[in-house]
Amino acid sequence: MTGGNISRRSLIAAGAAAFASRALAQAAPTLPGGPPGPGTVRPPLTGPQVATPEPPLFPPFPVVGSIEKLDDSLSDLIDVNTPVEKILGGFVWVEGPVWVGGKDGYLLCSDTRANKIVKWQMPKKGSTTPPGQTWLQPSGYVGPDHQGWAPNLQEPGTNGMIRARNGLVVADQGNRTVAFIDLKTKKKTQLASGFEGKRFNSPNDAVLHSNGMIYFTDPPFGLNNVFNSPDREMDYTGVFRLNPDNSVTLIDKTIRPNGIGLSPDCTKLYVTDFSGWMVYDVDARGDVSNRRVFVPSSAVSGGDGLKIDNRGNMWTSSRDGISIINPAGKRIGIIRADDRISNCEFGADGYVYMASNHRLLRAKVKVSKIARPGA
């Protein structure tokens, strides 16, 4: 998990099971021999990306994983016997799940390579309507030809998405911006596109502070050739803060960030980095200091997105699946599946939802999402 030419998938591929690549439509080239390993850069896009369609899934959903308990305290968060279910397939590469609404709400997620946002809602009993539908396409880059792709982009669509400002704030990595989407009209408004006169790399993930500030990460994973992309304007990958007036503050420029989260009381900021999961102190004004290692990379080997539950536990993608780490930094359990998991989201219906390569998974939990104003 070192620097150089490495893709977003490479961060979590090293320890994943070596399953054969799914066949994608002709426009979406696949890499032979299973998931890309460390040092791999995916081929440039040559056209719109389209995954092979899959039949819709209805309850009872197929079970594709299980829970491993590493500490007895895990039982307070999730039942070790709860199944890990596949609820939706047919993605090229799924990211950024976000729950909208209450118990009967719905899940939105980004298909980053296909440049669309997909909506999933639990089907009503007896329904034959497919529960997964395209909600917005293109979700990110449009381009002068309106085809929604470009050869200099690995992932033209949105990535991380959060509820904020009474709508949706997205890491619009295809456009290299942070943007707001109105949930009713689906109109997109750019909030920030760069810092000190230079464009962002490709914003990746975000988290909302209770005071309305938004912290986000800016690695180059959306660009072709990632760290070596000639389109990069910044010579660093930053952690930033988007202020309520849409001004931008640089938090850290010395790490290679990916996922990001805040403790329930907003006094701790967590960021995944190649060298491990970092934690910072956050003061009452939202200023950040005292970076230190929270979990070393050697403990879980690579990572991607993360979420903090209402009790302060971290649920983060890792080599094994979703590692569950308590506030003291101890890994107490793992959600394992038969393919990579990039990140997760807590639904108001009592489930944790997981983005896993070309599909969505879920598992019943005993914790919930942190409630914050505007979310």
Explain the meaning of each model-derived region.
Residues M1-T2, Q26:
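Initiator methionine at the very start of the polypeptide chain
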Residues S21-A23:
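C-terminal segment of classical bacterial N-terminal signal peptides
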Residues Q26-A375:
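Sequence-structural signature of mature extracellular/luminal beta-sheet repeat domains
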